[in-house]
C-alpha cells in the first residue's frame, strides 16, 4: 500500500486546482485519474468555449495565457490543464480507477485498480457532470427516431437538413440549438418545461460573470425580486418567443437547485428571428411521435436530450451518509468536513452564478489551507 500526504480523486479542474493550491504549502498530492487529464473537457462538443471570462477563470497560482482570448475554447482549456500539471509538478496517476474508499485508522484507504493508497486526507473531485441523466419518459423504447444525450453531441454534421428537437434549457442545450441552425439543420425546436433565466455572456465588453460575482453578495430576497427585471434589462421580454420572464423566487430556486442561467451566445437572436421554435415539455414517446405536455405531437428526425448529469458519488461514498438523497450532492463542500468522515473533502459540486472555475479556485485554496493547518506528515 502506497502512503501519501493527500490523495485527490479526479484530474479535472477541481482536483488539479486543489493539488496546485497544496503546493503553495509545500504539500504534494497524489492525483488519481481513471482516464486522462481534463477527460470531461476533452469530450465536450467542438464549438464549446467557457461561458466565463478568461481573467476570472484561472486556477490557483497559474494564469490563463492572453492568447486564449476572452472566451477560452475547449481545446485551450485542455491545454491549460496539462500545462497546469507541469507548472506545479503535480503527481497525476492516469489510468487508475478508484474502486472504493474506507476509513483506515485516523485516515483513509483508497482502493484502486492499481493497488491501495493510504492518506490522512482525501479530496474527492470526480466532477459535476459525471453521468448522463436521461429522464424515464414513457414509451422511450418505442421511439423510431434518433435520440442522444447532449453529452454525446460533438457537432451538427449528423443533423444537417434534419428536424431536430433539443430538450432542456441549460447552457449546453441553448448552444447546441445555435450550432444546429448555423450548421444547416432544417428546423430546430427547443422543449421547455421550466422557463430559464437568460442573461448576456457579454454586456458591451463587461462579462456577465462580473455581474454574477456581484449578485452573490446581494441579499437573496432582493435578488428574487430583481431577477425578472435583470433578465428584461439584459435581453428584453422573450415571452412572445416562448420564454416568459422568470417568476419571483427564481433566484432562490437557482441557489437551491443549481438551475443555472443561460449565458447567451446566440440563442436570443435565433429566437427573435424565429429560427428556433420553443415547444412544450416532453411527456412521452409513441413510435415516431414525441407527445408534448400541451397535447401536441411532433415528429423530429432526431432528439438531443440536454437533460443534465448526475454527480455519481454514491458508489464511492454512499455508505458514509454524505450524499443528499435526491440531488446526489455532497452535504458538505469545500474546507468543511463531516463528523462521519474527518479528513474527507469535496470540491467542484456547486455551480454558482459567479462561475465554476472561479469558485473552484477559491474553494481549492480554502481546502489547502485547512489541510496545511491540520497536517500530520506521513512517515
Model-identified regions with their sequence ranges:
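Flavin (primarily FAD) cofactor-binding/catalytic cores of flavoenzymes
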Residues: 2-11, 16-42, 69-171, 175-205, ...
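Redox-cofactor-proximal catalytic regions of oxidoreductases
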Residues: 36-61
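Short, basic/glycine-rich phosphate-binding loops at helix/coil junctions
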Residues: 56-63, 244-249
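A short acidic, helix-capping loop that chelates divalent metal ions and anchors anionic groups
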Residues: 63-69
Amino acid at each position: 500500500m502506497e502512503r501519501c500526504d493527500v490523495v485527490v480523486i479526479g484530474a479535472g479542474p477541481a482536483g488539479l486546482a486543489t493539488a496546485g493550491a497544496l503546493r503553495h504549502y509545500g504539500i504534494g498530492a497524489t492525483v488519481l485519474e481513471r482516464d486522462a487529464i481534463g477527460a470531461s473537457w476533452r469530450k465536450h462538443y467542438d464549438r464549446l468555449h467557457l461561458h466565463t471570462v478568461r481573467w476570472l477563470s484561472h486556477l490557483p497560482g497559474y494564469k490563463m495565457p492572453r492568447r486564449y482570448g476572452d472566451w477560452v475554447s475547449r481545446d485551450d482549456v485542455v491545454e491549460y490543464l496539462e500545462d497546469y500539471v507541469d507548472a506545479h509538478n503535480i503527481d497525476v496517476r492516469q489510468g487508475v480507477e478508484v474502486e472504493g474508499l474506507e476509513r483506515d485508522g485516523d485516515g483513509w484507504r483508497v482502493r484502486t485498480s492499481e493497488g491501495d493508497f493510504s492518506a490522512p486526507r482525501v479530496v474527492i473531485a470526480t466532477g459535476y457532470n459525471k453521468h448522463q441523466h436521461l429522464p424515464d419518459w414513457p414509451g422511450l423504447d418505442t421511439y423510431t427516431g434518433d435520440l442522444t444525450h447532449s453529452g454525446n453531441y460533438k457537432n451538427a454534421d449528423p443533423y444537417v437538413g434534419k428536424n431536430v428537437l433539443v430538450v432542456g434549457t441549460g447552457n449546453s442545450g441553448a448552444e447546441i440549438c445555435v450550432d444546429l441552425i448555423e450548421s444547416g439543420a432544417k428546423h430546430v425546436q427547443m422543449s421547455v418545461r421550466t422557463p430559464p433565466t437568460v442573461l448576456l455572456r457579454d454586456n458591451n465588453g463587461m462579462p456577465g460573470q462580473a455581474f454574477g460575482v456581484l449578485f452573490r453578495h446581494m441579499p437573496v430576497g432582493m435578488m428574487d425580486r430583481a431577477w425578472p427585471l435583470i433578465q428584461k434589462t439584459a435581453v428584453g421580454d422573450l415571452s412572445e418567443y416562448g420564454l416568459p420572464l422568470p417568476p419571483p423566487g427564481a433566484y432562490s430556486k437557482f441557489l437551491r437547485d443549481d438551475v443555472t442561467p443561460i449565458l447567451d451566445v446566440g440563442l436570443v437572436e435565433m429566437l427573435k428571428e424565429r429560427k428556433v421554435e420553443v415547444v412544450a415539455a416532453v411527456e412521452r414517446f409513441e413510435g415516431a411521435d414525441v407527445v408534448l405536455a400541451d397535447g401536441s405531437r411532433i415528429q423530429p428526425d432526431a432528439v438531443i436530450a440536454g437533460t443534465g448529469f448526475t454527480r455519481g458519488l454514491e458508489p464511492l461514498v454512499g455508505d458514509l451518509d454524505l450524499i443528499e438523497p435526491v440531488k446526489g450532492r455532497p452535504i458538505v463542500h469545500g474546507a468543511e468536513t463531516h463528523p462521519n468522515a474527518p479528513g474527507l473533502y469535496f470540491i467542484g459540486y456547486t455551480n454558482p452564478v459567479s462561475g465554476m472555475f472561479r469558485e473552484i479556485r477559491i474553494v481549492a485554496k480554502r481546502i489547502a489551507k485547512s489541510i496545511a493547518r491540520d497536517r500530520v506528515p506521513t512517515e
